[in-house]
């Protein structure tokens, strides 16, 4: 597919209304061609073979074959960029996170009532995510698992430095977007239980944050949770903003605390990575380490630069292992990243850089 060739999209959804609305929204963009639609995965299988789409939009819950089963088969037999269409419910959030773990690139939230008007309100986001998915590397999701890291396995530790982290010694700040739910899982899965505190921002709908925190907690030796306002930031813990709010850190004497911020979107995002990173630059400075993982757009790039200028070591995920090298690429081009690291080595480098941070 060249830049001049429209992105060929197949819509798979059991709702005729959703199929029609997505077709209308996507067809308005000259860079997209809707080549077909299917009411269930079994019909979709035949159309995929015949139409060879660049991107598939896939409803999670459908008759005849579960959307997750179909997705798993698709990614194993014919890897294709998939954008999930999911409901804004707790059950829908958990199912969508499972879909992302199986290889879906991104998702679009479907309103529970007045679906037609609701989807129209997301038209710009739908078009943007479909175009982004066409450029995504779905093969990057088949990554080998890295060994778990312990503090005595760090690469190049500072001679004589005690690898024990007190409350305010070190802080790791991470930002991610498209592809980030799985990238964050990989990173946290390989962090030791006594790692420095981690503060994170991942672009997600408000109703997804609780399920995401619970999912990460199941996969990590660290304690992963949604942050509460004023909560002390402790080693061995990782904090995410609660749904639809920014996360910042503040200094309180010899420790840091979480500050939940209900201010306006930044870079069109709420939560925004730049909000977190700028607070870390101002309040933790050289005691922090910053990282940007896979994601679309440029949120976090300027904040990471501010962290670097404040004395914090910084890194970004490399292009080869990123689903979308938007945010990491923007930070790299801005000169905000000291290192470019494959996903399977991010946890290792964060621990090593934490030991070296001043």
Swiss-Prot record:
Active site residues of this protein: 177, 203, 299
The family database entries (InterPro entries) matched by this protein are listed as:
CheB-like, CheB_C, CheY-like_superfamily, Sig_transdc_resp-reg_Me-estase, Sig_transdc_resp-reg_receiver
The record, for Gene3D superfamilies, names: 3.40.50.2300, Methylesterase CheB, C-terminal domain
Asked whether the UniProt record includes S-adenosyl-L-methionine among its keywords, one would answer: no
Q: Which organism is it from?
A: Xanthomonas campestris pv. campestris (strain ATCC 33913 / DSM 3586 / NCPPB 528 / LMG 568 / P 25)
Q: Does the keyword Magnesium apply?
A: no
Task: Locate the 4-aspartylphosphate modifications and list their residues.
Answer: 59
What is the gene name? cheB1
Show where the Response regulatory domain sits. Answer: 8-125
Its protein name is Protein-glutamate methylesterase/protein-glutamine glutaminase 1
| E.C. number | 3.1.1.61, 3.5.1.44
Give the protein's biological function: Involved in chemotaxis. Part of a chemotaxis signal transduction system that modulates chemotaxis in response to various stimuli. Catalyzes the demethylation of specific methylglutamate residues introduced into the chemoreceptors (methyl-accepting chemotaxis proteins or MCP) by CheR. Also mediates the irreversible deamidation of specific glutamine residues to glutamic acid.
Q: Which GO cellular component terms are attached?
A: cytoplasm
What's the top EC group for this one? Answer: hydrolase
In alphabetical order, the GO MF annotations are: phosphorelay response regulator activity; protein-glutamate methylesterase activity; protein-glutamine glutaminase activity
